[in-house]
Amino acid sequence: SNQTELSLNNGDSIFFSYETPVAGFASGVGHFKTSTWYSSTTSRHINKYFKHIDSNNITTVDDAFIVSRCNYDLQGVG
């Protein structure tokens, strides 16, 4: 269904719509979603991902924040 949730080693999670990271959960921040509008389909994916979360508890963040969360697992590898 072109939706993937990635669980990171630090307990955070990143939600992807197609291949784009658009939402997730981070300790210290809580639930977050992108401030960028991609498409109506991606918006539906995000809304479905947060179906059981009060919208007042979701922080809107820029894409750089989400990418930095994705890079967490890559730090110290090699």
Regions found by a protein language model. Name each.
Residues 1-78:
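Terminal leader/tail segments of proteins
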